[in-house]
Amino acid sequence: KIAIGHSLRFWGAFYKSRQMIAEGAIGTPVFGQIHRMGPSEVLPASKASGEMSDHWRSDTRYSGGSIPEGFIHELDYSRSVFGEVVSVYCESTGRRVYGDHVSPPVVQAVIDYEGGETATLRMGGTVGYNWNGTTICGTTGSLSFTGWGGPVYLHRPDAAEPEEIGCDDTLAYALELRDLIKAMASGGDPENSGLNGKKNYGLCLAMYRSMEEGRRVDFTDGIPDGIAGDWQYTGPAEIE
């Protein structure tokens, strides 16, 4: 058996919200909105072109670039909630000059899933404002959280205020190892299987391809169509 540890399925708010969804807290999940929008500094017009970061994690030769480094955890989480991806459309904005300043880069994607569910995802910078947060909307209620560690908020139509629900203190790595051991004993597959990791990274590559070609990328059985297994994105380290 192989498990890919690059996942936060068992971490804090990700794990707790998945438990609540499985227990029917919001009915059937149908829509998600995920923001990884960190606070950006004021960018001078000189930043309109060229690399915006020289950190190795932004270099596609070493890490895959901005998309997997920015929110592969959230992409995996969305798949754990909604199921297999059937298509994705992605575009990037920013680095436009407005007088003496330039707008920060932002990646935006719309993902469709096998049951007809949809999620919108944004990653990038907002000047002076930390715009992080995840919302999962269902047929009878919604869940939201802003930090990986929780708490999770349950929103019901008959409640004036959301219910705050704390997250377990159980170490995520212990839960991940427990899941792997269970899979080994039962002959099944762990949640963070090698195939799951391949699908996560395939989604990242499909987002790059969508931006490059300006079109929606379709999937078959959770794998993007028309992208070779050994294809590597070699575009700008920072999204342009």
Positions of PLM-derived features:
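Glycine- and charged-residue-rich phosphate/anionic-cofactor binding loop of Rossmann-like
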Residues: I4, A160-I165, A183-N200
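Short, mixed charged/polar active-site loops
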Residues: T118, S142, A160-E163, R216
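Glycine-/small-residue-rich active-site loops that bind phosphorylated ligands and cofactors
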Residues: R9, G128, K199
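Predominantly a Rossmann-like dinucleotide-binding segment in NAD(P)-dependent oxidoreductases
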Residues: K1-A3, L8-D100, G214
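A short glycine-threonine-serine/GTX helix/turn-capping micro-motif
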Residues: Y62-P68, P162-L171
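Hydrophobic, well-ordered secondary-structure elements that form the walls
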Residues: L180, G197, G214
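Contiguous beta-strand/loop segments that form the cofactor/metal-binding neighborhood of enzyme cores
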Residues: F31, E69-P151, A174-P190, C204-Y208, ...
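Amphipathic C-terminal alpha-helical segment
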Residues: V42, L203-E213
